[in-house]
Amino acid sequence: MTAQLIDGKAIAANVREQVSRQVQARRQEGKRAPGLAVVLVGEDPASEVYVRNKHRACDKAGVHSVQHKLPADTTQADLEALIDSLNADCSIDGILVQLPLPDHLDARPILERIRPDKDVDGFHPYNLGRLAQRLPVLRPCTPKGIMTLLQESGIHARGLDAVIVGASNIVGRPMALELMLAGSTTTVCHRFTRDLESHVRRADLLVVAVGRPGLVKGEWVKEGAVVIDVGINRQDDGKLAGDVEFAPAAARASYITPVPGGVGPMTVASLLENTLFAAELHDGMHA
């Protein structure tokens, strides 16, 4: 069996186009464009690239985006004051704080200070709690994007044995909630998991998000499994690699995401969807 590639770039482009059409429809109804504020602290090169990509995607979709670039020595109090002002700004529907923050700043109270209805990253305890209650509002972007990849590829998660490798707050844990909501029997593997291979071998649907190139051996992949590789790791030769050994996994899987061009584009597309959804929430609040 040779796996069919799940083209995240193409699916993300369709999502962005859909958002663009809905934004245009809003404007024709006399409503304002959705507004996204992106907060960047310090000068981390990778973060600057991510932020630039987000602004570019917003511009193409007609979403109004504003960047707040703060120096690396910004205090906790100053950052909290900025969040408070953005919470009160009626032109801003979504607030995104680009992680990681400099070491002297505590990200948790910053993320929790964002109003839940403006939390377009989906990291606020309120939004994670709603997802756990099976009543999602603003959903974490990467897991939401993965669910869109599955849906657009005609893959039904209901009844599948799903295994998630990685238990981060950003991907692994909310991914488990998404898959349970979709009807999968879900196992989460982490650094204390014994015999990772045995869990991977029984997975109908495998999601790997650890940040270790080649962690999951291709020979472990069950024949006909769906493989979603969230990892993106730069190797010594400068090439990008996922957390799964791609070629041997693709020889066994039915579907697989490439790295790059699989999950990554969906994260930004989901951010646009969340920002539009937040704007619609605010329409209802101010009606």
Swiss-Prot record:
GO terms for biological process: L-histidine biosynthetic process; methionine biosynthetic process; purine nucleotide biosynthetic process; tetrahydrofolate interconversion. InterPro entries: Aminoacid_DH-like_N_sf, NAD(P)-bd_dom_sf, THF_DH/CycHdrlase, THF_DH/CycHdrlase_cat_dom, THF_DH/CycHdrlase_CS, THF_DH/CycHdrlase_NAD-bd_dom. Its EC number is 1.5.1.5, 3.5.4.9. It comes from the Bacteria. Pathway: One-carbon metabolism; tetrahydrofolate interconversion. NADP(+) binds at G166, A167, S168, I232. It catalyses: (6R)-5,10-methylene-5,6,7,8-tetrahydrofolate + NADP(+) = (6R)-5,10-methenyltetrahydrofolate + NADPH; (6R)-5,10-methenyltetrahydrofolate + H2O = (6R)-10-formyltetrahydrofolate + H(+). One of its GO terms (molecular function) is methylenetetrahydrofolate dehydrogenase (NADP+) activity. One of its GO terms (cellular component) is cytosol. Keywords: Amino-acid biosynthesis, Histidine biosynthesis, Hydrolase, Methionine biosynthesis, Multifunctional enzyme, NADP, One-carbon metabolism, Oxidoreductase, Purine biosynthesis. NCBIfam families: PRK10792.1, PRK14186.1. Homodimer. Catalyzes the oxidation of 5,10-methylenetetrahydrofolate to 5,10-methenyltetrahydrofolate and then the hydrolysis of 5,10-methenyltetrahydrofolate to 10-formyltetrahydrofolate. Belongs to the tetrahydrofolate dehydrogenase/cyclohydrolase family. This is Bifunctional protein FolD. The lineage of its organism: Bacteria, Pseudomonadati, Pseudomonadota, Gammaproteobacteria, Oceanospirillales. The gene is folD.
